[in-house]
């Protein structure tokens, strides 16, 4: 079937898309309408924890679909209880609210913090966030984000999100006042160019929060569920946050997100928060399958081996091509280029024949890598070899 036969004009345009339609996927590979295969190192922007069409997920979907799909959040259902128990047992948090997207989870975190401020800090409502941070695309989460240009895109913004600089504790300290209720950040800023917070900064934020009686919120929408080498990124900094949000990898490709909080922060009254599909058993059952797979013996050790392979491969490529190194945590990594030709490299990689390569360029001088956590050693080596060839071809 030719691309021109697809009625793509029925879709509202929100981004520029190449002239291809993906029709199937398996593991680290996608196939388009013309039968061309692509090695996928984007995986839905770090969503597909187990790759495309993982058998564990398909099995969970089929089994749950045969039992119960959507009873309403007004009633308990078994998969949501089971997933909540797993998440709280594996973290420092006591309670979970399930949502459908990272933006919705972060919106919930903002509401929970503001409610806590009303109850415990005389109506404090300001949440300090970071320049270049990314928290979602609702009006409140766009306002919380520090993405350049977003302050005017749908003006006026939601008020109450002063911006500090990541890894600059003094910039956070200077913004704290009587109306401050929390500080919120991503442990690794993904859209900003895969910039990890330092251990000193994360521990300093926890100390600042304790000194001023405010909350410490981690947005682990992209970093959670094994992506950075531990189940949750905050665990690598030896800090205990008050609130955490998850999405992307928790569902492995199914719309699922979570807002987690410590008991003393759970101040929502009945009716303060809700949603039609929150805790949907079909999605939660898949979440259980993803959780059980990545916490099974040997899984994270294998992912850590692929992390070393990716990091060492990118460093070798950087040295060979005169680039500026690599950075990241776990299987969320970036190759820093010496010029702004990342978009051209992404396009050339996709156009490779007979099989393409899917990469991501959040910045003009940077490539981001977000493979499935179970990517094979052979596919990792193949990507590194293809990338070397593409960079050479683009820079002829």
UniProtKB/Swiss-Prot annotation:
Residues with the N6-(pyridoxal phosphate)lysine modification: 248
Subcellular location: Cytoplasm
Pathway(s) of this molecule: Amino-acid biosynthesis; L-arginine biosynthesis; N(2)-acetyl-L-ornithine from L-glutamate: step 4/4
Bound cofactor: record note: Binds 1 pyridoxal phosphate per subunit.
Cofactor: pyridoxal 5'-phosphate
Main location: cytoplasm
SUPFAM superfamilies: PLP-dependent transferases
Catalytic activity: N(2)-acetyl-L-ornithine + 2-oxoglutarate = N-acetyl-L-glutamate 5-semialdehyde + L-glutamate
Entry EC no(s): 2.6.1.11
Residue numbers binding N(2)-acetyl-L-ornithine: 137
Cell cycle in keyword set: no
Binding site for pyridoxal 5'-phosphate: 102-103, 134, 219-222, 276
PANTHER family reported for this sequence: ACETYLORNITHINE AMINOTRANSFERASE, MITOCHONDRIAL (PTHR11986:SF79), AMINOTRANSFERASE CLASS III (PTHR11986)
Assembly with partners or alone: Homodimer.
Similarity section: Belongs to the class-III pyridoxal-phosphate-dependent aminotransferase family. ArgD subfamily.
Name of the featured protein: Acetylornithine aminotransferase 2
Organism per entry: Bordetella parapertussis (strain 12822 / ATCC BAA-587 / NCTC 13253)
């Amino acid at each position: 079937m030719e691309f021109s036969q697809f009625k793509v004009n029925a879709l509202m345009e929100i981004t520029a898309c190449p002239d291809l339609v993906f029709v199937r996927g398996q593991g680290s590979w996608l196939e388009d309408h013309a039968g061309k295969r692509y090695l996928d190192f984007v995986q839905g922007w770090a969503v597909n924890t187990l790759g495309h069409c993982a058998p564990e997920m398909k099995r969970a979907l089929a089994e749950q679909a045969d039992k119960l799909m959507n009873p309403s959040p007004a009633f308990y259902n078994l998969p949501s209880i089971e997933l909540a128990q797993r998440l709280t047992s594996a973290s420092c948090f006591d309670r979970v609210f399930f949502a459908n997207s990272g933006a919705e989870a972060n919106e919930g975190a903002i509401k929970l913090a503001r409610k806590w401020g009303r109850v415990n800090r005389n109506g404090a409502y300001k949440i300090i966030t970071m320049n270049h941070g990314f928290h979602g695309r609702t009006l409140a989460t766009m306002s919380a984000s520090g993405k350049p240009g977003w302050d005017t895109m749908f003006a006026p913004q939601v008020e109450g999100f002063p911006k500090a600089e990541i890894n600059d504790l003094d910039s956070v300290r200077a913004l704290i006042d009587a109306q401050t209720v929390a500080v919120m950040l991503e442990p690794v800023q993904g859209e900003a160019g895969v910039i990890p917070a330092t251990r000193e900064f994360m521990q300093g934020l926890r100390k600042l929060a304790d000194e001023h009686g405010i909350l410490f919120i981690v947005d682990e929408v992209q970093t959670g569920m094994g992506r950075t080498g531990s189940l949750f990124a905050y665990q690598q900094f030896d800090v205990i946050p008050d609130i955490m949000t998850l999405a992307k990898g928790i569902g492995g490709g199914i719309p699922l997100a979570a807002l987690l909080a410590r008991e003393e922060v759970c101040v929502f009254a009945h009716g303060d928060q809700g949603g039609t599909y929150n805790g949907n058993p079909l999605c939660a059952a898949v979440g259980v399958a993803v959780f059980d797979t990545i916490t099974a013996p040997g899984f994270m050790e294998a992912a850590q081996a692929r992390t070393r392979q990716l990091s060492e491969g990118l460093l070798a490529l950087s040295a060979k091509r005169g680039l500026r190194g690599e950075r990241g945590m776990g299987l969320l990594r970036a190759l820093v280029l010496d010029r702004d030709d990342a978009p051209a490299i992404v396009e050339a990689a996709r156009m490779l024949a007979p099989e393409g390569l899917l990469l991501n360029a959040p910045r003009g001088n940077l490539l981001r890598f977000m493979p499935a956590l179970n990517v094979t050693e052979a596919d990792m080596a193949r990507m590194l070899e293809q990338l070397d060839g593409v960079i050479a071809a683009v820079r002829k």
